[in-house]
Amino acid sequence: MGKRVEELRKQNAGLKWDEYKKELKRFSDAIDSDFKTAFRGMLDAIEEQVPHLIDKGLNLKKRAFPVRKLILAGDDVCFVTEGRIGLEAARIFIEKLSALENTVDHKKYTACAGVAIVHQKYPFYKAYELSEMLCSNAKRFLASFNDDKISEAGTKGCAIDWHIEFGEIIDDLSDMRRKYETADGGT
């Protein structure tokens, strides 16, 4: 998002400070609105699937929705789900978001996500740190593409990195991945 803000600044270099602040506010408000729209779309999609999830044996409480919003401010999003739907919820959110276009710079959104699948009693702050590491890893993955891999939308796409944590608290993602490395070097 930083590159887009920088482009907006360059495009509006001739504006007075107060006018530029208004344009930046419109841009920020559009981002906030679009991310909330995508999140609502994800919730609606999950809600449609709840009866099917219950039929497949997912033990969902009748009055407890399986997604909880923790942070939804601008382009910062953090939510908690029932573990078995975490990846799908992230995929749906990113799909809904990438279909939207910002009304100020007229560009589509790209996003990366880190999905940490942990036990219910796993320390939340460690799960959050893990999801941040995973998201950073997904961003590095996208950054590794050459510019010739940029899509028609002018982006390199979206990415999700995920990890199922089995209870050991390890501070480094590469150490975690090394621990679960297969004989052929994959993880």
Regions inferred by a protein language model and the residue ranges of each:
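Charged, helix-rich terminal subdomains or tails
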Residues: 1-187
